[in-house]
Every structure is written in C-alpha cells, then in structure tokens.
Amino acid sequence: MSRALEPAEPILSAEGTPYSPRYDDVYHSTEGGLAQAHYVFLGGNGLPQAWAGRDQFVIVETGFGQGLNFLATWQAWRNDPQRCRRLHFVSIEKHPFTREGLAQLHAGLADMLPLAQQLQAAWPDALPGLHRLAFEDGGVTLTLALGDIEAVLPKLVAGADAFYLDGFSPSRNADMWSPLVFRGLARLARPGATLATYTAAGFVRRGLREAGFDARKAPGFGGKRDMTVATFCPVWKSRRHAPTPAPEWKVRHAIVIGAGLAGCAVTERLASRGWQVTLFDVHDGPARQTSSHRAAAMHAHISSDDSLLSRLSRAGNQYALRAWAALAGAGQPVGWHGCGVLQIGENEAEAEAQRAALEALGLPESFVRWMSPGEAASQHGAGVPRGGLWFPQGGWVAPPDICSAQLRRAGDAVQSRFGTRVERIRRRDDEWEAIDEDGAVLASAPILVLANAHEAPRLAPMRHQVMRRVRGQLTTLAPGQVTALGSWPDCVVTGAGYLLPVSEDGSARVGSSYEADDGPLVARTEVHAANLDRLAGLLPQAAAAAGNLDAAAMSGYVGVRTVSHNRLPLIGQMPDEAAAIAAAPSLRGAHLRDIPRVPGLYAALAYASRGLTWAALGAELLASQIEGDPLPLEADLVDAIDPARLLLRALRHGQVGREEGHSSGLSG
C-alpha cells in the first residue's frame, strides 16, 4: 500500500538557509542553492553542452527539495539556443513542500521568480505516485515521483542521460545512498550517462562503481574541497532490459482509428510532440458513440489497500485535470464543472468501510475527506441518507466538448477523416496502411493506434484481449420534473447510481444502468424506472415525488461501454500473438517486457465507465512509449493496463500452443 506523505516545513537555519529538522541538515550549501545547482549538477554533468542538438534529454534526480536544481536547469535550457527539443526532468521526493511552502522559499529568487511561480501554480497535492507537469508548451516536462526512494525508484520507467544526486548528507539520510539506490540508478542509465553529487563520501563512490559507474572526485563547490562525478560504463552486462536511446523517427506521422475520448486524446498528445495525425472515424464527427453523452462525472476510486485501480484512478484524475487546465490556458476550454463529488455508501456498513479506508490512507483533505449528511445538506443541498467521501476536485463535463477542444488544440497537425470506415489494416515496408472496403489505401504511417473500442478486434488479432459490450442508460429529468423533486444538489452525488447537478437548461441527469448489450440502443422504460429508484436511494426526500414520475415518458441517453475482463483499460503496444505462441515454451517464465510486440501498433481501448479518468493519462502514456520518453506511470501500473497481460498469463500457465499461432492477419 502507498504510504501517506508527510510534507516538509519551510524552515530556515540561523544563516537563512532552508533547513530540515527531520534530517537535521540544510537543503543546500550556505554559499547559495542556485550557485550550487549550476556548479555541481549542471557543470558536473557537462550541461548545457551535453544536450546540444539532441531531440530528447532525460535527467533523473534524487531529492527535489525546493526545486532549485530543476529551476536552474529549466533556465539554462531556455537560455541555450542549442538546447534539446524536449527536456525531461524526473525527480524523487519523499517529503514535498506544500505550494505555500515553495512560494515562501522562492520569494527571493529574483530573475528566476517567474519560472518558480509557474512551478508553484502547477504543484500537485501531496499524493503518493507520479505527477507529470508540463512547461514551455511541453518542451520541459517535470515528472515528480513522490514517495520513499526505495519504493519509487524500482518502479520508474525511463532512460536517463544524467543524474543529480541531491539527498541530504549520507550521515543524516542513509536511505538515499544505499546500494539498492545505486543499482536502481544503474538500471535507468543509458550508455554513457553522467552523474554528479555534492557529496565526496568514499562509500558513495565505491557503491557507484559496484553498480557500473566510473566514479571519481572533482573539485567541490564553494568551501568544499571535493564532490563526486561519474559516468555509466559497466564492464559487464547485468541488465535484462537496458534503456535504449529515444527512437529517431524519420517521419512523425500516426494513424488513429476512433475519434472518441481515447482517440482524440491520443491525437492531441501526439500533435503536441510534433506528430502529424490522420484521424479516422466512421461517424460524421468526433464523440458520436459512447463519448457522445452530454454529462459525465469523474472522481477517484478509494480502497483501504490502495489497490491498482485506486492508484490508477488517482493518477488519471490528477493528470486529466492538469491536461484540461492546459487546454483552457491555450484558449480551448473543455467546460469542466468542478463542483465536487460526494460518494456515499450503499448502506451503513459500506459507509464505515469508506471511513476506515480514508483513515488508513491518510490522503490530504484537498483531495478527499469525509462529509457528514448534515454538511452535505447545508453546503450542497444534498439530502443524502448517510455521510460519504467528498472529492473537492471532482465534477462533471460533456465528453464531446473535451474531444472538440483537443482537436482544435491539435490544429493543422490533424487530418480528420470523418465518415470513413477503415475496413482493415496492413503492415507493409515498415509502415501501417489503413485500407477501405474497395482495397484502396486511405493512409500510411509508421504508427497506428486502435482507439475504436469494441470495433478493434475486427482490425487486429485480439484473442487474448478479452472485451465485452455493456449497455448503459441515463435518464434526463426535464426542468419541471426537477422542480417537483424539491431541493437538488449542486454537486455530483454517487453511490448505487449517480445524479448530476442541474444543467443550464434546467434539466438534470440520473444514472446509470450496467447490463449486457442485448439489443438495439433505444431507451427502455424499465431502465428509466430503475434509475428513478437509484435517485430515491441517493435522495430519500425525493423518493415520493420520484415515484409519481412517469418512466414511460422519460427521455435519456443510451450507450455501450467496452469493458475488459477486469475493468482496467488496454493501453500500450499490442502483443504479437502469433510470435508469442510460436515461442510459447520459452516464454513460460516471461515478464511483460519479454512478450513480442507488433511494431508500431498500439491500443487505447476498454475505457468502460472511466473514459474521463483514463483518456488523457492513457494518451500521454502512449505518446511517451512511442517517443521513448520517461513514462508517466509506475511500472506496475503500466503492466496492469498492458494489452498483453492476459496473453502473458496464458503463456505462464501453458494455455497456448503452436496450433493457435498462424498468421497475425496484419500483413499482405
């Protein structure tokens, strides 16, 4: 389970240097934090010269502190005409400052204050896990890994070109300087990666050497005689999967099939990295199927053990909010209504379980807290039968508005081919071809992304990616019906069903069914009646009035969700099932990174009821995988949504054989 984070306090020493009473040490030399950053970390890694002319450069730091190393590196990047196209800065921090604490410590930064204020504005809540923050229109990306280094470092997926080791003194914080950490850094190091640190402790150099670094002394900063610099050049091969250089794409062009939440998000993320995208959808515009409904809610999942779903949904919610804010900042608002979400238990036992989970997790109240029935009624007009989890950052939005904003943001980088059906796809000469029913090639590109939900198995072999169709029906209450029900909440309320606040036209929505897709997508009276029962359970004072409404006269929305075997999405590079089956005996003890993959073919599928949660983060994950960037999720979370996960399980259990592995069906 993820541990609750304990934020650092902005305390100064007698000399005016930021100080940690927890470690009884200062955050940087009394000679000055920025001067130390330039001398030790940039200079010790040969920056900015080392990134000159590069497409991508990745720095991994241990100990973010007040962020001076990041700010100094960002400023150096801005000032360098030979800078790399994209700078990635990945930093681990166990005790992050709050936004207010950073502002206090940054107050005297003078000409760097504008950058510091951008960092403060983007600063996340103290939630364990990875937080990706983008600056300079994506040219500079900060990925904060919040948590204990011994837990976080093994889960990072990145290829590092340089390391900043900036933990507190080894004598005060030994966990940051252990052999486990040094081996973890070596796992991430690209060939020739450099390293610098303020410390000159002999055991640090010895530990780095044992991990494959050529570590040596260098003249220290200020009054310190020595520091340590290193280069990764192991004399033996000990890594099963070594980081590789970022791919050098001759042509940045991708085909995306499906223009719902998944496909539009992928299109925008690829366009932000300089890709041209040809977007296909059989309908006459974006968000015409499952993503077409005019109101969808989003909040995180909470569990006492901080399960994979809980961690994924937390990451997805946080990234989505940042992504939508960035769209709004670029003049493309998505219409997000951050009214908050109240999630109540279906009964008192479930409510007690919610409270116990909340207490066990220790998450900040800015993310989730307990709300009593009295507070829900007085503050939000929600006459709920019991207390529940209050998500102040939750809310609702119209998915089509997100899709439209993303495509507008992509601009000329996207060629939308609406009303066009891709009949099949084919791999030829290192490119993917989208082909119509007459056999004509509609487009070709080195990358193809399947974002077309339950239609995907029609285009690619997916024997081991189990998906099913689940019907969902929302009920729309007309303005007069809402008035007849009495007080209506100004927030989203969820439990055994959900209801949304009143829309601008005075209507409100209640949902939703979750049933097998067994017929035409038309509204059913009995489902409207069931939704009214759900409403009565959420707002007991409205039960009598709801019982008087005529379900047969109701209108609403009907759609189909695409759901995986465990309700987690399928996001990542597609497995080559034929190759894996042919090599089945050798893959009995395999890991996901051992599974053969189809070159250039990716999936963004099975978002089920959490399209708002998965779409933006899933798109950033895919774009990062394609570009060879550090991933925005921990390795175990990436594995949890990998399209090859069921194939891996079948291989491990000996449940596949050569008789399955004929043609992949993707060439010819």
UniProtKB/Swiss-Prot annotation:
Q: SUPFAM superfamilies from the xrefs?
A: FAD/NAD(P)-binding domain
Identify the keywords attached in UniProt to this record, alphabetized: Cytoplasm, FAD, Flavoprotein, Methyltransferase, Multifunctional enzyme, Oxidoreductase, S-adenosyl-L-methionine, Transferase, tRNA processing
Catalyzed reactions: 5-aminomethyl-2-thiouridine(34) in tRNA + S-adenosyl-L-methionine = 5-methylaminomethyl-2-thiouridine(34) in tRNA + S-adenosyl-L-homocysteine + H(+)
Q: Where is the signal peptide?
A: none
Biological process (GO) annotations?
methylation; tRNA wobble base modification
**Principal place where this protein is found?**
cytoplasm
Which terms in the Gene Ontology molecular function aspect does this entry carry?
flavin adenine dinucleotide binding; oxidoreductase activity, acting on the CH-NH group of donors; tRNA (5-methylaminomethyl-2-thiouridylate)(34)-methyltransferase activity
DNA repair keyword on record: no
Q: What is its EC number?
A: 2.1.1.61, 1.5.-.-
Region (tRNA (mnm(5)s(2)U34)-methyltransferase) location: 1-233
Question: Where is it localised?
Answer: Cytoplasm
Q: Does the keyword Secreted apply?
A: no
Please give the Pfam families that the UniProt record associates with this protein: DAO, Methyltransf_30
Entry similarity comment = In the N-terminal section; belongs to the methyltransferase superfamily. tRNA (mnm(5)s(2)U34)-methyltransferase family.
Q: Which HAMAP family match?
A: MnmC
Q: What does this protein do?
A: Catalyzes the last two steps in the biosynthesis of 5-methylaminomethyl-2-thiouridine (mnm(5)s(2)U) at the wobble position (U34) in tRNA. Catalyzes the FAD-dependent demodification of cmnm(5)s(2)U34 to nm(5)s(2)U34, followed by the transfer of a methyl group from S-adenosyl-L-methionine to nm(5)s(2)U34, to form mnm(5)s(2)U34.
Write down what this protein is called: tRNA 5-methylaminomethyl-2-thiouridine biosynthesis bifunctional protein MnmC
Protein species of origin: Cupriavidus pinatubonensis (strain JMP 134 / LMG 1197) (Cupriavidus necator (strain JMP 134))
Query: What are the top taxonomic ranks of the organism?
Result: Bacteria, Pseudomonadati, Pseudomonadota, Betaproteobacteria, Burkholderiales
Q: Gene name on record? A: mnmC
